Amino acid sequence: MRLTENQKELIREVSKKNIRSSRQAALKCLGEVENLDDQWFVEMCSRLLNEETSMYDLPSEIQGLLTVEDVSETFHEDRYYLSQREKKIFDQIIKMQGVTEKLALKDIRYINSTLMYGVPGTGKTMFGRYLAYKTNLPFAYLNFSNIVDSLLGSTAKNISKAFKFAISTPCIFMLDEIDAISTRRDISTSASADKEMSRTTITLMQEFDHLPNETIVLAATNRIDRIDEALLRRFSNKYEMTVFNNQEKKEMITKYLQAIEMTISKQDMNNLINGKKSQAETITELIQCIADTLMKEQI
């Protein structure tokens, strides 16, 4: 059977596991089908276009350890505000990805890895989802506090299981609360706990070193001071994520409101931007403000 250009594009994008591009190609393929005789092909394209379809059915052994999301269906770029500091981080990561691809051609392993640190609620995870959206890669999220196991050696095994996906599939690999396991080895707790933590940290670094150049690693922590120095050296970039100043909060709120075509009073705006609230706290209060406004309209 002679393939059309759209069908060739579909095969290319599916092989690269680019969900968004695969769906766009599938839509083009369905548009050029003159009859429904090829039942299997039509059914496969239709399933691909179904937003519930996931190209990343995880093995049972890592379900609950790792979550993988196609953010093209869930991320609202029009509501997301990128500060100038975060834009610099984003630009650096994108430039570095081009470098890693060139290094891969020379058979040189190099991981595009960034560690984001700072107080909670400053948008570390949301930045990871934004990066996945812009790069058209799946967002693989691993929260280290969820993989700690009381059984001896089990935490290290859980890490190895979770890393299998990122090693085999190019993605944005988000390592959240990385300080939960990779504690500096000079911070002593108990002899048995120290051995287990050391074993876990070594496993993490070994798995980290096996990641392909195509995978982009983002790690997040609130306690960079507790992370093992050998692991810190594996991150090519380290950035502090800080609470927005009042002007940045105002711009963030304004963009969100414009996206949903709503407004709030000047007093509400001042209440939202003043104080030391984090980005997450500000957005939570904004949504409550919007809900209150809509509630008043119902009365």
Where are these regions (language model features)?
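Conserved AAA+ ATPase small/helical "lid" subdomain
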Residues: 4, 14-15, 22-26, 30, ...
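Structural recognition of the conserved hydrophobic beta-strand(s) that form the central parallel beta-sheet
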Residues: 174-175, 202-206, 215-221
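Short regulatory helix/loop adjacent to the ATP-binding pocket of P-loop NTPases
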Residues: 223-236
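Interdomain "pre-motor" coupling segment immediately N-terminal to P-loop NTPase/helicase cores
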Residues: 18-76
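Substrate-gripping "pore-loop 1 plus following alpha2 helix"
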Residues: 187-209
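Pre-Walker A (pre-P-loop) alpha-helix and adjacent loop at the N terminus of AAA/AAA+ ATPase modules
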Residues: 71-113
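Conserved AAA+ ATPase "SRH/arginine-finger" region at the nucleotide-binding site
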Residues: 236-250
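Walker A/P-loop
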Residues: 110-142, 160-168
